[in-house]
A protein has these predicted regions:
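Iron-associated oxidoreductase/ferritin-like identity signal
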Residues: 1-160
């Protein structure tokens, strides 16, 4: 059984993952409305991935006898600036999510819930990848400048 403290932390993370999904979906539609279909496609897949994280966490908690409590999701920002600004925001957001996941692992260690610690370690590893990917895109956007946006849009549009 998962402790009440861990249940609260995991429920908060499920909400955060759903919010992240909404954030990336909002970014996707904004980018597509600006004619950046490839960047929008990349963000739409990112949104689906975040929803998958939330579902995986909820399924895990249910399997362990915990109670999933879906919470209200705050409104996400809209009306973004440049493509670079959007991806900088995405990178910053991924760094924040990493800290939230680390907190759950720390609580699991304190509670001696090694199954939950083990389950969330995969998200720790995934966040390293997420941060590196977002940071890499930001770097490429900075190097490419406005003249390279079409090429990068096409490249990111190939994400599967």
């Amino acid at each position: 059984m998962i402790t009440d403290r861990l249940q609260k932390a995991i429920n908060d993370q499920i909400t955060a993952e759903m919010w992240s999904s909404q954030l990336y979906l909002q970014m996707s539609y904004f980018l597509k409305s600006q004619g950046w279909d490839g960047f929008g496609h990349w963000m739409a897949l990112q949104a689906a991935e975040e929803r998958g994280h939330a579902t995986s966490m909820a399924d895990y908690m249910t399997e362990r006898g915990g109670v999933v409590k879906l919470q209200m999701i705050d409104v996400v920002p809209e009306g973004w600036g440049s493509v670079l600004e959007i991806f900088e925001h995405a990178y910053s957001h991924e760094c924040k999510v990493s800290k939230m996941i680390d907190r759950i692992v720390s609580i699991a260690q304190e509670e001696k819930d090694y199954a939950t610690e083990n389950f969330f370690r995969r998200f720790v590893d995934e966040q390293v990848e997420e941060e590196a990917t977002a940071s890499g895109i930001v770097d490429r956007l900075k190097k490419a400048g406005d003249s390279g946006l079409l090429f990068l849009d096409s490249q990111l549009g190939q994400r599967k």
